[in-house]
Amino acid sequence: MAMTAEVKDELSRLTVSQVSSRKAELSALLRFAGGLHIVGGRVIVEAEVDMGSIARRLRREIFELYGYGSDVHVLGAGGLRKTSRYVVRVSKEGEALARQTGLLDVRGRPVRGLPAQVVGGSIADAEAAWRGAFLAHGSLTEPGRSSALEVSCPGPEAALALVGAARRLGITAKAREVRGTDRVVVRDGEAIGALLTRMGAQDTRLTWEERRMRREVRATANRLANFDDANLRRSARAAVAAAARVERALEILGEDVPDHLAAAGKLRVQHRQASLEELGQLADPPMTKDAVAGRIRRLLSMADRRARELGIPDTESAVTAELLDEA
């Protein structure tokens, strides 16, 4: 089951005892999933959701909290719809429900954000508002670089109200418009986990956190492997470059190179992949890596000085792009 479906399934089965929270959830669900229609002079409340369990929860809450019956219509998958959709409709008492849930204000005008009783309610009401909004139009992507918990909103006022509810819960959410649709997005991994718990999807949070941890472990392992590969490549190129410079130095100096410097240089050329420490152990008598490095450095310096005097290419000229590409 996809993460979004897991969250919605868990939330649709959540038992909430506090009446004000149940009302806040219902108001948000109707606001984010529904619309008000005037048919034959009557106000009709409709809400379209993507799971049967959400439709059942919605109908049950409408009846238990306000005593109104509702109809449900199933829109089968087909065309642009990949899955079935469920439309819950309250026709006979639509206007009364719209007023009681805050979809209409006292003058009978549609409320553009969230109802005042939800915005000014308790922390539990803020959690319930997020639960209702997510059940209506929420989504949760798999953990990763672009992971996000997102809710599509019916307008900018509703988006800002949802951002405010998140702020009351100590969670940073951002409102933005994407392709003409207002959305509220939470991207931080810790904040996503906290919000899932706040809404009541603790089991899904544990699953999400486990997947997030596994992904982070894999990403860390990949970074370390790439780091090691890069270090090996750098070391190989440095060794090839050093050997090429030493070869050129011996060429420039010819018979004039001091024996101890020539010996260190020949070791570098003969054992191109060996570390300085390994070259020191191969020397006769053995030397420290600092001694080997010092002798090679002096050899190169002497050769470069001679090259300048003679007006010929120095040791750096031996290190070509082609040479490094082959390393």
UniProtKB/Swiss-Prot annotation:
Taxonomy, superkingdom: Bacteria
Protein keywords: Cell cycle, Cell division, DNA-binding
DNA-binding region as annotated in the record: 275-308
Molecular function in Gene Ontology: DNA binding
Biological process terms in GO annotation: cell division; regulation of sporulation
Function of the molecule: Involved in cell division and chromosome segregation.
Family of this protein: Belongs to the WhiA family.
PANTHER family: CELL DIVISION PROTEIN WHIA-RELATED
Protein name per UniProt: Probable cell division protein WhiA
Organism: Nocardia farcinica (strain IFM 10152)
Gene behind this protein: whiA
